[in-house]
Regions:
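Non-heme Fe(II)-dependent double-stranded beta-helix
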Residues: 1-52, 56-63
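Generic beta-strand structural signal
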Residues: 30-37, 48-50, 70-76, 85, ...
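Short edge-strand/loop segments of extracellular domains
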Residues: 42-44, 92-97, 152-158
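A short secondary-structure junction signal
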Residues: 48-54, 61-63, 84-90, 98-102, ...
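Short, surface-exposed loop/helix-turn segments at secondary-structure junctions
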Residues: 54-57, 102-115, 164-172
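Short, conserved beta-strand element in jelly-roll/cupin
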Residues: 60-82, 120-123, 152-156
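Double-stranded beta-helix
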Residues: 68, 80-138
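Non-heme Fe(II)/2-oxoglutarate
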Residues: 133-134, 138-235
């Protein structure tokens, strides 16, 4: 389910967790930008496989390529995740560029790639997954469902002035107007969380501080979030 923050206030409040946003700042800088939000639901017995892949379509040949240029995702696990229903990754592959997955699969003798490991979590755990990391999942043949509250962030330099990849939203040039419009979800989320947890110290997002932008969380705010994900900063 894409654009999940417009459908679930629980997801919206999770999105604004101050400790998670501090991590986003430490990785992508204080002017980091949103990427995309989704709910991934993998039911027991019917949850399909997702082939090995690397996320990101835009910067693989960039002169400025580095291991963080396509951003990262937080993966918050509602029920936890296991080797049966969870995501598997091949550690270190986010650092080496685009991978020949067909050759890697052939060299490994099948889809169980040599060196791959599962992401195993307890309920409530949050994983950080680099989007360039080779990852995938197998059919959920077990008895436990997996629900992942997924949301990602970019370095501003990775998206400003860049033409989107057209995967999560229609391709467009991500100018400052688009980025500001897409970032409003952060303002609403922070305010929604503040209403729910008034004693908690809220995260201060630098771009809002610089522009003195003020948000309120109310019924009009909910309406303003409708289809916000059409501006997903998909690279």
């Amino acid at each position: 389910m894409l654009g999940s923050l417009q459908f679930s206030e629980a997801c919206l409040r999770t999105y604004a967790h101050p400790e998670l946003l501090k991590v986003a700042e430490s990785i992508n800088g204080p002017d980091f930008t949103p990427f995309n939000e989704a709910l991934f639901i993998k039911e027991p017995g019917i949850g399909a496989a997702v082939s090995w892949h690397q996320d990101g379509v835009t910067h693989w040949e960039s002169e400025d390529f580095d291991e963080d240029i396509h951003g990262f995702n937080f993966m918050a696990q509602v029920y936890g995740s296991t080797a049966v229903n969870g995501v598997w990754v091949l550690p270190g592959t986010h650092k080496i560029g685009k991978i020949d997955i067909k050759k890697l699969t052939k060299d490994s003798g099948g889809e169980r790639l040599k060196g791959c490991v599962p992401i195993i979590c307890n309920p409530g755990d949050v994983v950080i997954c680099n989007r360039q990391l080779l990852h995938g999942s197998f059919p959920n043949c077990g008895y436990e469902r997996r629900i992942t509250v997924n949301f990602g962030f970019h370095k501003r330099s990775s998206v400003l002035g860049v033409k989107g990849g057209g995967v999560h939203s229609a391709s467009q040039i991500f100018n400052s107007v688009v980025i500001e419009r897409r970032s409003r979800v952060l303002g609403y989320a922070i305010e929604a969380r503040k209403q729910r947890f008034p004693e908690e110290e809220s995260y201060k997002y630098q771009p809002f501080n610089d522009t003195k932008k003020i948000f309120k969380w109310n019924e009009n705010s909910r309406k303003d979030l409708k289809d916000y994900n059409l501006d997903d900063l998909s690279i």
